[in-house]
Structure formats: structure tokens, C-alpha cells
Amino acid sequence: MSEDPKNIKRALISVYDKTGLEDLARALDNAGVEIVSTGSTAKKIADLGIDVTPVEKLTGFPECLEGRVKTLHPRVHAGILADTRKEDHLKQLEELEVEPFQLVVVNLYPFRETVASGADFDGCVEQIDIGGPSMVRAAAKNHPSVAVVVDPARYGDVADAVANGGFTLEERRGLARDAFLHTADYDAAVSAWFVDQLSDGDVTTPLRYGENSHQSATVTRIGTTGLANAKQFNGKEMSYNNYQDADAAWRAAWDHERPCVAIIKHANPCGIAVSEESIAAAHRAAHACDPMSAFGGVIAVNREVTVEMAEQVKEIFTEVIVAPSYEEGAIEVLKAKKNLRVLQAEHEAPKEEVKYISGGMLTQEPDTYQAEGDNPANWTLAAGEALNESDLAQLEFAWRSVRAVKSNAILLAKDNATVGVGMGQVNRVDSAKLAVERANTLADGANRAEGSFAASDAFFPFADGLEVLLEAGVKAVVQPGGSIRDEEVIEAAKKAGVTMYFTGTRHFFH
């Protein structure tokens, strides 16, 4: 990116931190730059014997409300926001008798420092800057015409720029980036402080330790809903791992619209089931998927926990149970297990997923059941005969449930419950083998894979993974499709006489 520098003829300066202001003002003055400034900044510059135009002279409107209103005026912001590349903008400025700025230098009220000093609520609120961020954001937006500086450490760059014809477009873009980061950080500090002030307890709470005993950890509560803000009725304090597993279970349970129970261990499902009969029936079915792994697991429910279900849970060693509500008497039943953590939480769909990596972070929209391919009405019949309504509902249950399984994921379901889960394998064949093995060995030696409904979170790259399921006797398969070997996979399903649907939507989970 290259462009001739934009000459700086007029600058707006409004700074709380006066560090480096004298050198900056002298550099601008020596270069013949007209300086417009506010309040104490203008006074400091004038005291140096440097010509400065007070902003109230520019606007024709006095500073008022104890300094709350200084620069929030069209004559200021028109001069900042005018895109001087556009003839109509220049014409409007001429008609309004407004001169454009080429440089805006601002730093903000010391909000963080005020909070750290122990100031009271009103004192902290008074240090929330309004006009400063408005000027910074306006100048950053209009970086093709304006350079914005928010850090006194960059004043030397300003001096160099005014002496050498101004900042280039590339440099102004970099300054705009820094400015938006600055205002975002400032707003984050203000919003976090408000959350802290208005919450019932500490926003950030230390945990006993992290994933392992040598790791420190905390939980930070944002807002008032969701798992982090759950009300705890019983049991020991929540641990880092408890929160991890409870979150995975909570997500799995709320992936279903029907009454659902999800049991999780090490962030993977031991069992998931839905039931219109009762939530207790859903719990029995979820537990039956893998009773051994469910020992010491975490349970999440998307409906009210009944006394009947509580009586069942009481008989099984469970670390955590979380639900939106509890039937009268259910909590008293669960309290018989003194170490069982009993949580009540208001469901809140996540707005964003964040993962820190070396040198930065990743963000993404959460993977919820909202894609077109998640609706069975939009599935493509790739092999076999179309399923009747009842069987299609079973296959949809498998598809909804497989999203809770770590990739590569294969899930087998029957009678609205998982019966075999193959999770976290580095190839899809092993995931299929694991799902079949667990279906056929974890419950009284029953051959549960036969006649089950299979879901794969991503396509089969070869027919071999599907063939494992076909040999086990699955009734139908749902998968995204999209492999370059789809025809090979389809042919295997057709040869076995097994129905297979393509969703066109993938649900990787890492």
C-alpha cells in the first residue's frame, strides 16, 4: 500500500494525560500547524506561549455541565469526519464554514486508575469519557483523511510526520487500528466494572485449582444467566473440571427441544436421551447407554427435575446435576448426597466462542442447530428407501446428539437414546468401531447396534467407516456428505440395503 503523505495543517488536541504535550505542541507550532484544543489542554499549550484556538471559540458554544460537554458539536465532528477525497464533502464544509482536521490527538479520562483508587460509584462514573472516545472513533473511521493518535509514546512519530509532509495512508490505517483497540479496551473496562458493581457477588472467583492441581484457575461471571451464574443448593464448591463437564452437558441437553437428559464425563457423552413420558424416563435411558462411564458423571436436564428423577440420581454417584428448575421436594432428595453439586441455571445460548492460542485468540459463532441442513425436511436421500416418520425422528435424534461428541464422532441411537458413542478418534473407522463396541458390550451383552440409527458428524472419506456400521446392522445413517468418494460410500449403503441421508451440514467439535 502506498500513497503520498497527507500534509497536516490543522490539529485537534484533547488529552487528560499531559505527558509529552509540550514537545508535541512545539513540534506542531514549528511546522505551522493550527492547533485547536480543549479545557486544561488548551490552557497548558497557551501557557507555553503557543497560539491555540479554544474549542468553544470554534463552536461558538461554551464548555458546560462541569466539562461534560466540550467537543460534542457538529463544527468539531464535521471537521473530523469530512472525507476530503469527496468533492461534495469539501463543498459542504465550505458552505458550513468548517475547516477539516488532519490530526486528532486524544487520550481518555483515567477510568481504570479511578476504579483502582477505591473511588465511590459516582466518582467512577464521572471518569467515564464520552467526548474523547467519540473523537477517537470518528477520526479512526475517517483515517483516509485524518491521523489519530491516542498514545503519548507516538508523539515523536507525529513530530517526524509534520516535518516530512504528514502520515501515509498505511500509517494512518495503523493508527486507526490502534485507536479502535484503545476504545474497545476502554469500553471493556467500563462494562466489566458495571457488571461487577451490579452483580450479587464477585465477577471473578478463584477456584481451588485448574484442570490439574498444579494449575491456578478462576471463573468469571458475565451477566446474570447461564451456567456460570447458576444457583448452587448443595455439595462442594464447583471445580474447573466440574464447570467444563457441566457446560458440555448443558449444551448437549439444550440441543434438544424434547425433554432431555445428558450425562457427560470428560466433556464427552456417556448417554443422551429424550422422553415425552417423563424426565425420569429420559434419565433412565441416558444412564443405560453406558452405566460404567456414568459413574461420577455430570448430568444436565433441559426440563424441571422431578422427585422421581431425583430419587434415581440419588442412587448413582454423580458429581453435578444442573437444571432450569426442580420440583418441590426434589432438592431435598438430592441433598441426601452431601457432595452432589445441585445447580439451577437459566439457559442462555452462547453468543460467541473464544479460544486463546499462542500469540492471539480465535472467535467463532457458536455451532447451534440453525443450519439449513439440520432440518430433516432438507436432507437428501442418498441411498435406500425413505424412512417413515417414526424412524426419521430417531435418525434426527442421533443427528442432534452427535454434535455433543468430540470429533471424529460416530453415534448410534435407538428408542430416543444413545446406545453407542465413538468419540475423539483420529480416523472415522476407529470411531465407528468404538461406537459399535460400546453399543454391544456395555449393557447386559445386548447387541444394541443392530437396528440402530447412526450419525456421523462429518462425511465418510472412504466407505470403510460406513462398512463397520453396516456390518453391525444399523438401520439408517445420516451424515453431511461431500466427500470426493461419496459415490463409493453410497454404493456400499445401497448394496447393504441401508437408508442413508446427506445433510449438507457438518458438526465438527474439537
UniProtKB/Swiss-Prot annotation:
**GO MF terms, alphabetically ordered:** IMP cyclohydrolase activity; phosphoribosylaminoimidazolecarboxamide formyltransferase activity
Annotated domain remarks: The IMP cyclohydrolase activity resides in the N-terminal region.
Instruction: Respond yes or no to whether keyword Zinc is given for this record.
Output: no
Q: What is this protein called?
A: Bifunctional purine biosynthesis protein PurH
What metabolic or biological pathway is this protein involved in?
Answer: Purine metabolism; IMP biosynthesis via de novo pathway; 5-formamido-1-(5-phospho-D-ribosyl)imidazole-4-carboxamide from 5-amino-1-(5-phospho-D-ribosyl)imidazole-4-carboxamide (10-formyl THF route): step 1/1; Purine metabolism; IMP biosynthesis via de novo pathway; IMP from 5-formamido-1-(5-phospho-D-ribosyl)imidazole-4-carboxamide: step 1/1
Family, as annotated: Belongs to the PurH family.
Tell me where in this chain the MGS-like domain is found. 2-150
Annotated GO CC locations: cytosol
What does the UniProt keyword field contain? Hydrolase, Multifunctional enzyme, Purine biosynthesis, Transferase
HAMAP family found in the cross-reference section: PurH (MF_00139)
Its UniProt entry gives the catalysed reaction(s) as:
(6R)-10-formyltetrahydrofolate + 5-amino-1-(5-phospho-beta-D-ribosyl)imidazole-4-carboxamide = 5-formamido-1-(5-phospho-D-ribosyl)imidazole-4-carboxamide + (6S)-5,6,7,8-tetrahydrofolate; IMP + H2O = 5-formamido-1-(5-phospho-D-ribosyl)imidazole-4-carboxamide
Q: What is its EC number?
A: 2.1.2.3, 3.5.4.10
Q: Name the species this protein comes from.
A: Corynebacterium aurimucosum (strain ATCC 700975 / DSM 44827 / CIP 107346 / CN-1)
Which BP terms in the Gene Ontology apply to this protein?
'de novo' IMP biosynthetic process
Concerning PROSITE patterns, the annotation shows: MGS
